[in-house]
């Protein structure tokens, strides 16, 4: 059974956005002071405290450097304390990127250049912020490694004939590897498998030779069938005098229709029959 290449992402810690955070006494004092400052500076402070995220975005909020209880906010309006809280917006829309052409040595020792396109999105905004610095860039780098690992265990024939199956297997492996980063890989498409020029010429010559051999076989089979038909017709004509007469009339008719300027002198069929009988003897 053929082993498949697997790619594992670095282990990441588990984040529970609903776990309550226990602040120190100093942290609680700073928090209370910040709330009082915002309260006494209303309504001016409202311009700095109210933030908006779009339908396709989520906001991950940090208070005093720690993840705020409740998970990501959005879509809509949310409230932050400028002095002690910060936030980061995460786009949840599907993103696509091209994997640069990768030089890969196949299982049967053929060097090919393969490029692909990856479609992914952020499925968990909180995890993508906490566990990885740049989820998009990390996914791109991991996709290149996954492409090389998977295609390195395939033959050239499998790469050319089983693109869909390889793409689905790559998508499953890449999705599993990026799950700790809060990334969902939606689709993987192998765009092109480019062969060396010399190999392309060799494959073209082989295909041309195969077509020529097939044409010769078909021609030989046709000649064989025609020879059998002629032999059967000769047997029928030899055993039936009427068949000779009918064939003679058919030949005269075809000659007169094709060449109207040709003068035909009919030849007695009895003499033809004598020639045929003498030839058969």
UniProtKB/Swiss-Prot annotation:
Gene3D superfamilies linked to this entry: 6.10.250.2090, Band 7 domain
Domain of life: Eukaryota
Presence of the UniProt keyword Membrane in the record: yes
Gene assigned in the entry: sto-4
SMART domains, per database record: PHB (SM00244)
Similarity section: Belongs to the band 7/mec-2 family.
Source organism of the structure: Caenorhabditis elegans
InterPro entries in UniProt: Band-7_stomatin-like, Band_7, Band_7/SPFH_dom_sf, Band_7/stomatin-like_CS, Stomatin_HflK_fam
Predominant location: membrane
Membrane disposition: Single-pass membrane protein
Keywords, ordered alphabetically: Membrane, Transmembrane, Transmembrane helix
Cell location: Membrane
Residue ranges crossing the lipid bilayer per the database entry: 28-48
Name of the protein in question: Stomatin-4
Cellular component terms (Gene Ontology): plasma membrane
């Amino acid at each position: 059974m053929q082993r498949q290449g697997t790619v594992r992402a670095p282990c990441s810690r588990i984040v529970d956005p609903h776990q309550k955070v226990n602040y120190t006494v100093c942290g609680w004092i700073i928090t209370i002071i910040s709330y009082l400052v915002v309260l006494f500076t209303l309504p001016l402070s409202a311009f700095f405290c109210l933030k908006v995220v779009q339908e396709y975005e989520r906001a991950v909020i940090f208070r005093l450097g720690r993840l705020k209880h409740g998970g990501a906010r959005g879509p809509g309006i949310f409230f932050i304390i400028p002095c002690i809280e910060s936030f980061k917006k995460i786009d949840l829309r599907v993103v696509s990127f091209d994997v640069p052409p990768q030089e890969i040595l196949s299982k049967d020792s053929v060097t090919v250049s393969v490029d692909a396109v990856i479609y992914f999105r952020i499925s968990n905004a909180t995890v993508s912020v906490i566990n990885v610095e740049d989820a998009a860039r990390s996914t791109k780098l991991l996709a290149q490694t996954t492409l090389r690992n998977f295609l390195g265990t395939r033959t050239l024939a499998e790469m050319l004939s089983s693109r869909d199956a390889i793409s689905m297997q790559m998508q499953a492996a890449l999705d599993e590897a990026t799950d700790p980063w809060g990334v969902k890989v939606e689709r993987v498409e192998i765009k092109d498998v480019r062969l060396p020029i010399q190999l392309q010429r060799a494959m073209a010559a082989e295909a041309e030779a195969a077509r020529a051999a097939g044409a010769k076989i078909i021609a030989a089979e046709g000649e064989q069938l025609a020879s059998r038909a002629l032999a059967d017709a000769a047997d029928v004509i030899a055993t039936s005098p009427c068949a000779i007469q009918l064939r003679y009339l058919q030949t005269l008719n075809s000659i007169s229709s094709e060449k109207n300027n040709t003068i035909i002198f009919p030849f007695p069929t009895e003499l033809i029959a004598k020639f045929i009988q003498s030839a058969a003897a």
